[in-house]
């Protein structure tokens, strides 16, 4: 259906002159120009030129049409060329008549293509004729009711009151010259002939028509793709660095990993893994292209399968652990803790592995014209929805729910005990959750925009294809819509790891973790750097659980004394999952 829509666009542009419903008489017999594309395809030399028509313009129009027939099929093309030549350059018959006053008058008449010739072309070209070449239908008629493709002959009547009344019967033209070259499809560069390049059993070829495929690489946004790639690489590198820092801080250095730390650690791991898939692709030019001309990589190309699995696993990991972070924040704002965290852990990781492996079993990991190796849905299948979008929407729904509930709890907390420090920390976490929610929502919503604009994309490709069929491809530029949204999508996806760093990586507790890390102290001691790099001494207070402001013992003690008046902010706990509350932090 996509190929059909594409052809409708380009043929409607070029076949306007064929759609004339008038047969104009009073024309002239002209020699078929050697520059005519039909010069070698007709067995006569004179054709009927309608009054007002130009031979030069006629030659150009027919040449453009024949070039566009490269987008049809080997069965249709030669028959369509033959029919178009007979219709555009009808054989001219001259009738010389003598009037009653002994004056001679000449009548030039066209010999129209026979219906039998039309039927030969109609069968292989039926889909094209029915949809956009209706005037080439064998039942078509001129505006005066005369058949365009007569069965045997056409009657022409000329009357002049009191002077003459002539009737002429002109037999139809059944000329057929088979040209072997006419059946060869010559796809205009940079398109490739599917007959020469499509390998049986291989997939991920993109057909423009039944005979022509896109070459690889193919840029939807020419001249802008490199800008997107560089932006994506830069932002992803920043995100990777911040995620790596979060992994060190909450997964390697802590003396004890709490539930909140594990959630942040899992999210950061997902960000690093997602970035890794981009780094693998960036090591190879035109990564999406296979070694076979015109074929985009599919799951049979192991590197494409690997990057697809890595990206899917990393993206789903970050998406699934984002609501867990929000849930932990919501529970903490209620001065409680998560029960049965181990069950959540098992459930989330199991679902992540299943959703990553499922498309692989269906053979759906492949590159496309617009995306790198991931789940391919060009065939309209539901693999992307089942394996990514629906689970992601569920996760985003939970993220939204817990963010709203957290806002309510924080507002109640502030109303009872106003504290700007607590409010600032809570607002920072809430804003981080909202940014994550926006990023994930925008990234998933872009799919619906792209699908809604699919016809617009094919219109743009149609204009581009018309251009390359006429002349130098380097002068033809594809103007596809949606570049701004595509660029914004690159940004929002690339900064996911950086967002979680802003929310949790800049908390004062991070400094505390690094200072109190026994692993870091051991490394410094082994390297002989412990005398040069002094870490803070480990506190013996069992109530040092907030850590959201200040790092000295005096500040922590002051914080404990004030705990009955105002609960501290739900920051990242270094010893347990309960912040200091009105029981002085005792659990």
UniProtKB/Swiss-Prot annotation:
It comes from the Eukaryota. GO terms for cellular component: membrane. Glycans are attached at residues 43, 61, 96, 101, 152, 180, 232, 288. The keyword Membrane applies. The chain crosses the membrane at residues 233-253, 261-281, 305-325, 341-361, 388-408, 422-442, 491-511. Residues 539-552 have a biased composition (Low complexity). PANTHER family: FRIZZLED AND SMOOTHENED-LIKE PROTEIN P-RELATED, G-PROTEIN-COUPLED RECEPTOR GPCR FAMILY PROTEIN. This is Frizzled and smoothened-like protein P. It comes from Dictyostelium discoideum.
